[in-house]
Amino acid sequence: MPIATPYEDLLRLVLDTGTTKSDRTGTGTRSLFGHQMRYDLNAGFPLITTKKVHTKSIVYELLWFLRGDSNVRWLQEHGVTIWDEWASPTGDLGPVYGVQWRSWPTPSGAHIDQISAALDLLRRDPDSRRNIVSAWNVGEIPQMALPPCHAFFQFYVSGGRLSCQLYQRSADLFLGVPFNIASYALLTHMMAAQAGLGVGEFIWTGGDCHIYDNHVEQVTEQLSREPRPYPELVLAQRDSLFDYIYEDVVIKNYDPHPAIKAPVAV
């Protein structure tokens, strides 16, 4: 059976048809607006194989989000530096993803734990069309070190299986998107386990899908490689979504091509 390669197909599409655009960082991009990728989570864990992806950073970042944290110190303590470029001297990033997920402020001064609410809704009313988590808090964006790129996501249950669709307003295809695909696929597995559901699909929807000009050479190298079978995720059982630790996430049979380095546009 041929290996599905929606990510590599998107890279190819942007290289071939993307529009030349300027951007906030001054780097320049090839860009395409609006695209969707679908991954069957029963056909393997969608971790890109055409280059090695740093799985430790993916897992710790998701656990950091679920902690409701917005300071990089906890990440640094675990050897993860992917947020360092945007942090203040004290490590603070402002009210970014984790804060919005776990502690969205209301006008009355209360806070909403969107993740707990989403899990509760999956258990009580799996057919709800309102099961959405948003990191795009317009009133707090000026205080954020970086406005959310992966802005909001929705859960959907059919036939006892949980699917998740993410909307990503800004998609750095070479460096960022492989992380985002794996991170939300992992979150879907965790939420499904806690809700007593199987897994369905992870659906990624992108807005501005771009390849930075200084990543074109790396993307070309990546696309010259033959995709390999996706690995398998083994997730330990936990009583609570918020009890997971790094060692609970095991990715088996991950056999990627070597990593390809590229500069981050800040």
UniProtKB/Swiss-Prot annotation:
Coiled-coil intervals, chain numbering: none
Pathway where this protein functions: Pyrimidine metabolism; dTTP biosynthesis
Keyword Transferase: yes
GO molecular function: thymidylate synthase activity
A GO term from the CC aspect: cytosol
UniProt subcellular location: Cytoplasm
Matching PROSITE patterns: THYMIDYLATE_SYNTHASE
UniProt: (6R)-5,10-methylene-5,6,7,8-tetrahydrofolate binding residues: H54, D172, A265
Catalytic activity: dUMP + (6R)-5,10-methylene-5,6,7,8-tetrahydrofolate = 7,8-dihydrofolate + dTMP
Single GO BP term: dTTP biosynthetic process
Residues holding dUMP: R24, R129, R130, R169, S170, A171, D172, N180, H210, I211, Y212
Assigned keywords, A-Z: Cytoplasm, Methyltransferase, Nucleotide biosynthesis, Transferase
PANTHER family, per database record: THYMIDYLATE SYNTHASE, THYMIDYLATE SYNTHASE 1
Role, per record: Catalyzes the reductive methylation of 2'-deoxyuridine-5'-monophosphate (dUMP) to 2'-deoxythymidine-5'-monophosphate (dTMP) while utilizing 5,10-methylenetetrahydrofolate (mTHF) as the methyl donor and reductant in the reaction, yielding dihydrofolate (DHF) as a by-product. This enzymatic reaction provides an intracellular de novo source of dTMP, an essential precursor for DNA biosynthesis.
Subunit (UniProt): Homodimer.
Protein name: Thymidylate synthase
Species of provenance: Mycolicibacterium vanbaalenii (strain DSM 7251 / JCM 13017 / BCRC 16820 / KCTC 9966 / NRRL B-24157 / PYR-1) (Mycobacterium vanbaalenii)
Lineage of origin: Bacteria, Bacillati, Actinomycetota, Actinomycetes, Mycobacteriales
